[in-house]
């Protein structure tokens, strides 16, 4: 009839974005620079905001990115015993317009979610995985806020 397995058997399954812990640690190192670049970009975007309400939203996102940077640095140090060298002092690329900046920020947040999901699958169970889950939900919240700002500004 049907091929069946005892209730305790589970066929092996690996998500396509699963990576090793070593790969996750390398991506954490990259994430530090990514969060720093986002922070610099958002500083430029804040200056272009048409009003203080929108500037405050972006400032809140920027401040979250600073916190993410610190958490990623701590995770990297905890896993490797080494500190990540200071992020480069490069300047943020110029923002051509407020709307284009919002679009770029929105896409950047979505890309971060994809990268961080891979890191999440490479981390062991526990506080680091839980912390990264918080960062992922922050990035989703940021994407939602940028989407809201885009809709608001494009409908005017």
Each language-model region and where it sits:
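Non-heme di-metal
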Residues: 1-156
């Amino acid at each position: 009839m049907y091929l069946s397995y005892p209730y305790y058997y589970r066929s092996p399954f690996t998500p396509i974005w699963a990576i090793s812990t070593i790969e996750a640690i390398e991506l954490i190192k990259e994430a530090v620079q990514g969060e720093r670049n986002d922070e610099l970009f958002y500083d430029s975007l804040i200056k272009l905001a048409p009003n203080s309400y929108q500037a405050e939203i972006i400032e809140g996102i920027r401040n979250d990115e600073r916190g993410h940077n610190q958490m990623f640095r701590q995770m990297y140090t905890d896993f490797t015993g080494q500190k990540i060298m200071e992020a480069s002092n490069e300047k943020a690329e110029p923002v051509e317009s407020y709307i284009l900046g919002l679009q770029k920020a929105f896409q950047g947040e979505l890309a971060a979610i994809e990268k961080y999901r891979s890191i999440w699958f490479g981390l062991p169970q526990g506080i680091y995985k839980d912390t990264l889950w918080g960062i992922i939900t922050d990035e989703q919240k940021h994407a939602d806020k940028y989407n809201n700002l885009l809709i608001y500004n494009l409908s005017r």
